[in-house]
Amino acid sequence: SLHMNKKRRLEKILDMLKIDGTITIKEIIDELDISDMTARRDLDALEADGLLTRTHGGAQLLSSKKPLEKTHIEKKSLNTKEKIDIAKKACSLIKDGDTIFIGPGTTLVQLALELKGRKGYKIRVITNSLPVFLILNDSETIDLLLLGGEYREITGAFVGSMASTNLKAMRFAKAFVSANAVTHNSIATYSDKEGVIQQLALNNAVEKFLLVDSTKFDRYDFFNFYNLDQLDTIITDNQISPQHLEEFSQYTTILKAD
């Protein structure tokens, strides 16, 4: 049989890898009808490109290329200073009398903590995040509404049709959401169900804010739920690279935390 060219072979190997995360030399030889030597060389080439890790007798996908969802507890310890800075910046934009939506995510939990510590503002908060709710529920100046629905323990969020139906009827002065990845003109998250809720909240807000730390730029995740050019503002930390600042400013306003 005529062998496919190298580029095609490498694509095929990556496709096979994406299915279960690991692959053996034998599977490659059987599938692509190539020699042991060629199979090994192909894996070496993909490893050099940073797309996989060679193992004894095969290879495995590098976890950075596979969207891995971390729990909100695990995420809490990541980039904490940056998240606090972002939350402070976002908090400063919330005015007395505002009705706001706060989505799930550790940066938004931080925003809830900032809001709780702030005196003299009466606001209304709607959230589908249990951690956010638990922070704000004993505040005397915040009218609080928790959206119920199907519970996702990994992020502490309520999602699904029940949450969507309730959200559709609501309007906000500002919506604050987070995401796992920002690439080109889109923002993405791991769960389509969470993405849908965030999409609805943004659609129903006069001002739309995305809170992401600078590690989220040029990353990929599973479900694209919004376009950057439909947002009013991205709030990020001051570690954002000049390249990312320039690239993503063509779509929307980027506000750097102090």
Kindly give the residue locations of the regions a language model identified.
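Active-site signature of alpha/beta-hydrolase-fold catalytic machinery across serine-
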Residues: 110
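Conserved phosphate- and dinucleotide-binding cores of soluble alpha/beta proteins
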Residues: 5-15, 21-28, 33, 38, ...
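Hydrophobic/small residue at the entry helix of a nucleotide-binding pocket
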Residues: 107
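HTH-adjacent hinge/linker in prokaryotic transcriptional regulators
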Residues: 2-12, 18-26, 31, 37, ...
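A general structural motif
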Residues: 97, 120-122, 205, 231
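Conserved SAM-binding loop
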Residues: 101, 125, 190
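Catalytic core of membrane glycerolipid acyltransferases/transacylases, capturing the structured
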Residues: 114-134
